[in-house]
Structures are given as structure tokens and as C-alpha cells.
């Protein structure tokens, strides 16, 4: 890949291929403009060069192209692979909404239906891993709903599990736990879970019971084993013992729960929420690495 001196970067520059900080981490997607804050980050992190396999796009060649930011986004995600990822992401998000609707109506799907869905997500990752990651980091704009959050957390948990060299059946269990980790929120009264203002102490205690409800949904209603239920129940526990619902700590927290916790935290940072904008993937990772909790 070519080396581009950081000092030569200017806001608004665009390239025909992504700009990389190193061999794996993208700082700017292909055909997206370099932002002043991107340059500031690179300098703050004391990076001297970035890398790309592409060429700088001549601004004059784009003068006649309308579309603004949305046009740039559309162009950046217009490859055949990204179009397929976008189509399947939308389809799978809707399937999760259907799962959650059925759970809410006390008509939970069975474990075989969930397993079949996870197989489809695993196939998507196997075929388009890099494009899926790009979509989670850059392709979704606007607030994410519970289904999209669940899909993102499931994909990220699978990717972490694969990097940990988990066996195939363990990856399936991990994915099911991640997918259903917050299903227990559907057992919390809507007036509490949808409340916009600050929660009262009693309401907060109610919210903190949702992992237990998730465990019961997973094991009693859907029919998964404890290997799927326990990580979902433990995903809000923390290494220092300050999590919930049982305040367990350290290695007493299952590995799968720890993986889901990391994926969940990262997903929350890169997804837009009503009270804040999404972070970039790099900022989210650096925030997590700097969080001692």
C-alpha cells in the first residue's frame, strides 16, 4: 500500500480506497472526505503516515455531482458486496424485530428457529466480513433500534469469539446469548423501559432485573441450555464486581458474558442514540481501552 504523510492530508480530501492507520484499522472509508478531526486524531496519536491502495480523487471531477453527505455515503457503499450486506442487514434486523414481537406476546420462537437465523448471520460474516464491519461502523445513519443493536452486538460477539478461536458450537451459543441478551427488557413495563427522563431508584432497580428475565426467556421459553442463558444473565456484570444483577466479579463471569459485554459496549458507542451522536470505531475502541471499569 502507498504511504500518505499525515502532514499532507487536508480536510475534504477523498481517496478511491480506504485510508488505513495500520494494516487493519481504517480511519477514513473509500470516497468519504477526510475530516479535520480525523487529521487531529492522527496527529494526537503521533502517526506520521497513513496507508491506502487507492488514489486521491480530483475534486474537479466531482464538482458536477450532487448529493451532499448522503450522496457520499451512498457512493461509499455502492459496491455489489456492500449492496448485498445492506440488503441482508435490513432483512435480518426485521427478523429480529419479529422475534422480539413474538417474545413480547409470550409466543417466543423455538431454539431451532434462532439457530437457523444465526447460521445465516455466520454465512454473511464468512462471505463479507470486512464489508459487514464497514457497515456497522459507517453504513448506518440515524438512531438504531433494539433489533439493530442486537444484530450489531451479535455480529461483533461472533467476530470476537472467532478471534478467540472458540469452537463452532461455542460460537453458536455465544451468538444466541448476544442476540437475546436484552430480550428481558420486554418483561419490564413499557412506561419504565421507554421513559425519556431520569429513572427513579425503584425504576432503575426494575431495569436491572432485565438480565434475569432474559435468562428465563432463553432457557424456559425458547428452550436453550444454561450455556446460552447464563452469559445473557451475566452480560451486565463487571470485572470489579460493580455490575448487576448479582455483583459477581472477575473470572466468575463467564467468558461468553465478557465477550458480549465488550461487544455491547462497543456497539453502543458506534450506534447513534437519542442522547448523543455515534462515535467513530477508533474513538470507541480507545474509549473502551481507557475505561478501567
Model regions and ranges:
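Active-site-flanking alpha-helical
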Residues: 188-189, 241, 271
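Membrane-cytosol interface segments
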Residues: 1-113
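Conserved beta-strand-loop-short alpha-helix elements that form
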Residues: 258-271
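Acidic/His-rich, divalent-metal-binding segments that scaffold phosphate/diphosphate chemistry
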Residues: 66-208, 215-227
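Active-site neighborhoods and metal-handling regions in enzymes and metal-associated proteins
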Residues: 210, 270, 274, 293
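Histidine/acidic-rich helix-loop-helix segments that form or flank divalent-metal centers
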Residues: 178, 218-221, 225-257, 275-276, ...
